[in-house]
Amino acid sequence: MDKEIKRTIILEHYQNPKNRGLQGKDGYLKVNTNSKSCIDQIDLEILVENGIVKDIRFDGEACAICTSSTSIMIDILIGKKVEDALNIINNYEKMINEEEYDEKILEEAIVYSDISKQPNRKNCALLTWQGTKKVLNNDLKKIN
């Protein structure tokens, strides 16, 4: 993907993030994600019903990479089975860590494929994905 297209996608999701604002409703699984190396501090609410990710909401303060990657993650994961969402997250983590991954399932998240060239930004790109993974893994354990 062209660098200018990547930049445009990242900026769009940073300036107009999807699902910003917490619901505070029952049924949402909650997780707080904090970075030790950046200003990133994001609260996530994740609604899973019948093994499907129905909604993900977020709020907090974060840099452009963290905010945009959260927005893109939300776009990709809503409507997915928990197992499929976890597979996408695992592939995203592999991409960020320069391991072999399946780019076909990453959709717009592929814009972060070069983030490893900026090691100080890797945590920003991974923060909410790892928080979501933790919540979904815990939910999957309850189901099984």
Regions found by a protein language model. Give the residues of each.
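Domain-level signature for proteins that mediate thiol-based redox and metal-cofactor handling
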Residues: 1-144
